[in-house]
């Protein structure tokens, strides 16, 4: 039986079809917004997974190129690994839904959202969050709290819900708000230096817009939702919990109140060893329970420390930043480097400048076709003092890299202002909280060191939240470190400049957070951000005047678009010869803009000279110094400009009569010629005789 329900959101139809497809899934839906369609399937294992201390939720965001009428490139002609955008979209779905499952639920749950049709005006990533929540609510899986998502833009000073393609191009804000009926769940934002008050209002606007979609989900559940399964929730053995708490409570408290990180960790490890020695035999098959109890005890101590004692694990005030350090130019051959240190968190960011041809080509369902500015983030095991295999970037690394990239994107100069491709790589050297925001600061330093004329310096800070069990008490923390992140309830990352916010990413372990938290976090983040920017300015306040000696030099020139074919030549013959002869890289745009790049300045000048010659218009009546390229019985062909030849008839070779062309010129001779005519077929007629006469007349004068 196909159950259908529709509503209208921002002037477009939101529709769900349940029961039509995926009959063997716990729940399968077609959810559409306009002509964008998401196929969602949700399933759960029948029994909890044994021996784990986490909720095994798997969220997959699958892109199908047929959704936009494309055939995948390459030899195989099918979709391969997920794109970075798909990974980020999957993370957004996961971060919204995960806290809403029952605490202690250990059954494997898989949510698969497959993009099967895309209308450019309606973003599939927004629909995927709504579709996933809706499918879970309709299923028998014990997920009962609907969550909704909208995108908020600012166009001509007004908030707009789910702007279309044209609207997104105009909008100065790209904000995703995910919420339940009562609280905000997740925030993602990128903006052009948005003032704090405006951002807060935009989040409130987005929350209100989410309520319409939540009401739609509730209506769907009431009409055709499945009966929910009774969850089997993980619970610690009460006797074990009592024994461990009585034995270790005082020791845990004493250890957690140690301010120095390494000393505190060593003390906690010692407590764990003592507990294992004391109860290892009695609870040999319940070591996971012991670990869970100790974790809960640590968390309780940290919460009491913050909410009751009003002190942080390292003794800082709630709004205090750890000691800061900034350095530039620490690597001799790179194009730009920035070393940013905040407490025990340290990131080195390296900037590399390349030619315009080195942009990243994107092959996916996204609107963007290429990227000129990119940021990559690496988080090796040594950054936390651990031994880990070095593999490719995971979801976390991709997410952190994209977040720092978004923070700087509005500040990057245009292609016309700075004709380079820009790649930043942030290497996390030491991690004790908020390395993604340290990457923003390191990126600013590296860009300024590389001579990139960004609008102004940017910085990022991570805010945290600690709440009481009943949520009656809460404390917002500035610049959270590892222990506060681990035992805390929220990670609220804000980046921007002195003028406003350029990026936000917020997720929580709770079932949402209040607007009071949103306001306090955003306002406190500004104070911290300005402090960090002051420190950056002490190190380097403006971009270096010149790019590195080891960076390519790029010059821009404009040519008539009709002349592009002359520069490229048949099969690329002409442009390839220029590249081969001068050692440059050449990029030509459809509007006739030409970018010439090389580390050899002389090569750039030579290439520009050749291109100018190729595109210069031959004019009748002008005199040129040309080279004889071919001799026939009736005259000589002379190249007056690159790839432009004309004929000097034998009668026009000299003032006197010429019997044989070879008597006057030979191949390779350079001679003065005058353009006498360009016929309607573009053929150029030349005269050496007229050029000689004109030259003699000038000499007589």
From Swiss-Prot:
Mg(2+) binds at residues 485, 491. This is Polyribonucleotide nucleotidyltransferase. Gene3D superfamilies: GHMP Kinase, N-terminal domain, K Homology domain, type 1, Nucleic acid-binding proteins. It holds the Pfam family RNase_PH_C. Residues 552-611 form the KH domain. The lineage of its organism: Bacteria, Bacillati, Bacillota, Clostridia, Eubacteriales. The gene is pnp. Its EC number is 2.7.7.8. Its cofactor is Mg(2+). Residues 621-689 form the S1 motif domain. It is found in: Cytoplasm. HAMAP family: PNPase (MF_01595). It comes from Clostridium beijerinckii (strain ATCC 51743 / NCIMB 8052).
């Amino acid at each position: 039986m196909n159950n259908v329900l529709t509503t209208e959101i921002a002037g477009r139809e939101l529709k769900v079809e349940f029961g039509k497809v995926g009959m063997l899934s716990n729940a399968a839906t077609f959810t559409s917004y306009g002509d964008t369609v998401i196929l969602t399937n949700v399933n759960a294992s029948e029994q909890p997974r044994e021996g784990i201390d986490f909720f095994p939720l798997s969220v997959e965001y699958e892109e199908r190129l047929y959704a936009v009428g494309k055939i995948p490139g390459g030899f195989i002609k099918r979709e391969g690994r997920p794109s970075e955008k798909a990974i980020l979209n999957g993370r957004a779905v996961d971060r919204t839904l995960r806290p809403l499952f029952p605490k202690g639920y250990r059954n494997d749950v898989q949510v698969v959202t497959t993009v099967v049709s895309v209308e450019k005006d309606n973003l599939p990533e927004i629909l995927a969050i709504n579709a996933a929540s809706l499918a879970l609510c309709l299923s028998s899986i014990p997920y009962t709290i609907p969550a909704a998502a909208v995108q908020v833009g600012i166009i001509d000073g007004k908030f707009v819900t789910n702007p279309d393609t044209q609207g997104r191009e105009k909008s100065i804000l790209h904000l995703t708000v995910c919420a339940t009926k009562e609280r905000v769940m997740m925030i993602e934002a990128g903006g052009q230096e948005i003032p704090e008050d405006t951002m807060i209002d935009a989040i409130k606007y987005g929350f209100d817009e989410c309520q319409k979609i939540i009401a739609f989900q509730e209506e769907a559940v009431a009409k055709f939702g499945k009966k929910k399964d009774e969850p089997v929730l993980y619970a610690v053995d009460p006797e074990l919990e009592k024994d461990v708490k009585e034995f270790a409570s005082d020791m845990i408290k004493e250890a957690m109140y140690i301010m120095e990180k390494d000393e505190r960790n060593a003390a906690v490890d010692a407590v764990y060893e003592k507990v294992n020695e004391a109860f290892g035999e009695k609870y040999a098959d319940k070591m996971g329970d012991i670990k869970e109890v100790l974790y809960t005890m640590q968390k309780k101590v940290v919460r009491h420390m913050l909410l009751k004692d009003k002190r942080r694990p390292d003794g800082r005030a709630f709004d205090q930043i750890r000691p800061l350090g900034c350095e530039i130019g620490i690597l001799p051959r790179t194009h730009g480097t920035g070393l940013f240190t905040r407490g025990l968190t340290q990131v080195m960011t390296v900037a590399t400048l390349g030619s315009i041809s080195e942009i990243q080509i994107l092959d996916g369902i996204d609107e963007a076709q290429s990227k000129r500015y990119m940021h990559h983030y690496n988080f090796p095991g040594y950054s936390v003092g651990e031994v880990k295999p070095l593999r490719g970037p995971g979801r976390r690394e991709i997410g952190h890299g994209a977040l720092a990239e978004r923070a700087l994107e509005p500040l990057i100069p245009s292609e016309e202002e700075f004709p380079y491709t820009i790649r930043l790589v942030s290497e996390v050297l030491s991690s004790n909280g908020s390395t993604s925001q340290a990457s923003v600061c390191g990126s600013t330093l590296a860009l300024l060191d590389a001579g990139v004329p960004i609008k102004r310096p940017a910085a990022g800070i991570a805010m945290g939240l600690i709440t009481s069990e009943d949520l009656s008490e809460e404390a917002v923390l500035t610049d959270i470190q590892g222990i506060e992140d681990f035992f805390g309830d929220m990670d609220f990352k804000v980046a921007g400049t002195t003028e406003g916010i350029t990026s936000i990413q917020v997720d929580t372990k709770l079932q949402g957070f209040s607007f009071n938290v949103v306001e306090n976090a955003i306002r406190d983040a500004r104070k911290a951000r300005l402090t960090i920017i002051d420190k950056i300015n002490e190190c380097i306040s403006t971009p270096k005047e010149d790019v590195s000696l080891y960076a390519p030099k790029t010059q821009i020139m404009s040519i008539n678009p009709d002349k592009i074919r002359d520069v490229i030549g048949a099969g690329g013959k002409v442009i390839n010869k220029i590249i081969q002869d001068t050692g440059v890289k050449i990029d030509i745009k459809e509007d006739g803009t030409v970018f010439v790049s090389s580390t050899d300045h002389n090569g750039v000048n030579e290439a520009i000279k050749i291109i100018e010659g190729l595109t210069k218009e031959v004019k009748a009546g002008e005199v040129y110094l040309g080279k004889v390229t071919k001799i026939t019985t009736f005259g000589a062909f002379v190249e007056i400009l690159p790839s432009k030849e004309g004929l000097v008839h034998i009668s026009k070779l000299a003032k006197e009569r010429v019997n044989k062309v070879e008597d006057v010129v030979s191949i390779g001779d350079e001679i003065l010629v005058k353009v006498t005519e360009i016929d309607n077929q573009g053929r150029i007629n030349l005269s050496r005789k007229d050029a000689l006469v004109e030259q003699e007349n000038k000499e007589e004068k």
